[in-house]
Amino acid sequence: MLDIKRIRTDFEAVAEKLATRGVDAAVLNEMKKIDAKRRNILVKVETLKAERNTVSAEIAQAKRNKENTDDKIAAMQNLSAEVKALDAELAEIDAKLTEFTTTLPNIPADSVPVGADEDDNVEVRRWGTPREFDFEPKAHWDLGEDLGILDWERGGKVTGARFLFYKGLGARLERAIYNFMLDEHGKEGYTEVITPYIVNHDSMFGTGQYPKFKEDTFELSDTNFVLIPTAEVPLTNYYRDEILDGKDLPIYFTAMSPSFRSEAGSAGRDTRGLIRLHQFHKVEMVKFAKPEESYEELEKMTANAENILQKLNLPYRVVALSTGDMGFSAAKTYDLEVWIPAQNNYREISSCSNTEDFQARRAQIRYRDEADGKVKLLHTLNGSGLAVGRTVAAILENYQNEDGSVTIPEALRPYMGGAEVIKP
């Protein structure tokens, strides 16, 4: 959520920044008018309340003097009626302002590339060289079916489209990957957490999914509960409505969880395979940091995600997302895109973002600065470390052999009981 004070004092600069995220200037101008009206009403209310207090004191004095107070009582009643009417108008205006402030995206950092969509993202670096095959590489869904480790047909029968069963060494591979990821993040100082997989609406509001993106989630009917779209939600809300000690920052959390997404608006996209599912495992990283340290922490978090891909020897690239492609809550985002041979393309496998104080303001997560004792909003960061299903897809395709088998990356073999190859 944006700081209304910043919008007031730096309106033109904020409007210019948000325009790069597709926010119409007319929306901000309307918000500015409503906010000005609100402040005018507040002045009127305070003036009327002061007058009412004066009249009340005069009534008390008149009664002590045994004077007639009918006119003054009538005047006070009129003042009270005016205050009540203005308070009601103020409540309506506050609701409108809340609608504006809770649906406006975050202000992009100065270093974010300006652009309309993913075509304007900027590549930062690459690691590894895509393998040159001397045979036609198969897509991971064909490999998985041929190896008997991924079953989409029965997933569709039991649940529906975009669901599957992992079997045998496929299930073992999935488990090996997320255990490996959690262990690696633990070495970097992250505290492992097992979170609830169901959260309430306040939690979804805190991280920015609600109210704007309800259609992308799975809600439990007639309840206040939602299946988590990412462990970012429970991890970030862990400290909702709390004041942390500044000397304890930064704080690192990591968690593996299922993620549930309706994929509204994704009809026809990635209809086969592990890239876009309604339910998938993901290892998440979340940080709580002081404002002056948050961008250094973003670089570290991105490096933590890269570490996983490097140890799995999977070629990837890092891109800085443009203003038009960033997520709603992000001030800056790096995407890690892994090489998928059958698509001859890099595909997103991690997204690492600094939301600055955007989520902290919504969730009221603050810290007491040990330097001056003041209570301030901290910065929150989140990143995938990594999406597990997409990692399975990348391993199957990059490590496939001509006979249809798949070599298991060396880093995962201790987690696979020493198995080296998945064979048909």
From Swiss-Prot:
Pathway(s) of this molecule: Aminoacyl-tRNA biosynthesis; selenocysteinyl-tRNA(Sec) biosynthesis; L-seryl-tRNA(Sec) from L-serine and tRNA(Sec): step 1/1
Positions of L-serine binding: 230-232, 284, 384
Pfam families: Seryl_tRNA_N, tRNA-synt_2b
PROSITE patterns: AA_TRNA_LIGASE_II
Any one Gene Ontology molecular-function term assigned to this protein's record: catalytic activity, acting on a protein
Sorted UniProt keywords: Aminoacyl-tRNA synthetase, ATP-binding, Cytoplasm, Ligase, Nucleotide-binding, Protein biosynthesis
Main location: cytoplasm
Top-rank EC class of the record's enzyme: ligase
Chemical reaction(s) catalysed: tRNA(Ser) + L-serine + ATP = L-seryl-tRNA(Ser) + AMP + diphosphate + H(+); tRNA(Sec) + L-serine + ATP = L-seryl-tRNA(Sec) + AMP + diphosphate + H(+)
CDD domains: SerRS_core
The protein's Enzyme Commission number: 6.1.1.11
CC terms in the record's Gene Ontology section: cytoplasm
GO process terms (BP): selenocysteine biosynthetic process; seryl-tRNA aminoacylation
Localization per Swiss-Prot or TrEMBL: Cytoplasm
Purpose: Catalyzes the attachment of serine to tRNA(Ser). Is also able to aminoacylate tRNA(Sec) with serine, to form the misacylated tRNA L-seryl-tRNA(Sec), which will be further converted into selenocysteinyl-tRNA(Sec).
Domain statement: Consists of two distinct domains, a catalytic core and a N-terminal extension that is involved in tRNA binding.
Family assignment from sequence similarity: Belongs to the class-II aminoacyl-tRNA synthetase family. Type-1 seryl-tRNA synthetase subfamily.
Protein name: Serine--tRNA ligase
